Amino acid sequence: MLPVIFFTVMAISVVIAFLARTGLKNMTVGEFLVGGRSFPAWLLYFLAVGEIYSIGTMIGFPSGIYAKGASYGIWFLGYILLAYPLGYFVAPLVWRAGVRYDAMTIPDVFGRHYRSRGLELVTAVGVLVALVPWGQYQFIGMQVVLGALGLSISPVQGVILAGVMAFLYLAVSGVRSPAFVAILKDSFMILGIVIAGIAAVVATGGIKETSGPQAVPHALVTMSGSPLVFAMTTIVVQSIAFYLGFSAMYLFTAKSERAVKSSTVWMPLYMLMYPFLVAVSYYALEAHPNVKNPNTIFMVATKGLLPDWLVGVVAAGAGLSGVLVLATTALAIGGVVSRNLVPNIRPESQRRWATVVIAVFLVAAAVLTLTGSTLMLTILNLVYYLLAQFVPGWLALMFFKRVQAWAVGTGLVVGIVASIVLYILNPSLGGVNLGLVTMLLNAVLTFGLSYLRPGPERLPMAQWTRGQKDVAERDVAQPVRD
């Protein structure tokens, strides 16, 4: 019964992906990548929360609490909560940049604002470096879900299934497919989390018995020293990077600034599901204390709490979460390669190129997952170390007039290289998040070099309105359109 429910829901999601194209006669690259900038607030909302509350919510969050204790749960919750008020003010500026430069990718914005093909290329490579481990993150989660189904399929077959579904989502409807599938995904994800959380509380005899000192070791729910410093600094860096990293692409799909703000207002409601996840995590600490792979703990606990058919519901929510974000990640990479990395591709050919790149990325990320799987929240940290490196460039184009393109590029390159080196070496630094260190280094280079040698004046996004051009912008060729 469990596999039947799981695969039925997956099949329904593919049908929804095909139906998402209804009414579209010509799938231009603009429709494919950013939905023609036509998404109303409600559709942007589902696309956005589909990205935010991914398989990391169901699989990675409990695994972090189970393996590392309270500090992982606190920073995971804290950075999302802080990101929303920041996003209410910052996200509309990202959308403005997309409209101003007819941008469909982050490199589009950086290259056109700073009038630098070199910076566009550097940004494109940086985005690719950041998004590949993010794709691996989704594949690892899918492996966990498929393994929990008890089917006689290998890890290779599992990642192939996830990759094929993600490709089908995108090949027919582009970004519209993930947007509409997100509605189905959210329904099953929330239902699965709530059911599992309630079952955990009932199984332990009540809330006090689930989270009280007799059930959860004191060391797992208290922080001091380095873990506390890590949690606080992680909240800061990841909340800042939240809307200035991979979230930019889905913001480009909105029809207006008002749609962006309206969708952001209601996103915190999804945080109500986290107490249920905490309940499952605490139940697992007592009921399953010796699980070797922490990534599996949510599904292990769920299988011990629920009948097979309800486990199928939970697994369907987790599976859709992984495939959905995997699809949007692949779409972002396809857009970057076809529009920014490979030169002189005609607009009418960019969609075909993007589709090919999507397929190549899915294969590459699957291979990386099979050969280098690790704890999910560890990979999440690496992703945010890398995404944080785009923050200085975004802040410069939003609020500053005379930042140099080469200074932004220098800061970006140094920040990315430093992030990878520090991730490999893993120095303690007193618990300070390594992404914060590298982001500050990046910012010092970006703004310090520009202070020493100011660039031409450019109107920042915070002061820009439609139809307005600054002096530097008048000399820029019009961006390529569909």
Task: Annotate each PLM feature.
Residues 1-482:
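Membrane-embedded helix-loop-helix hairpins and adjacent transmembrane boundary segments
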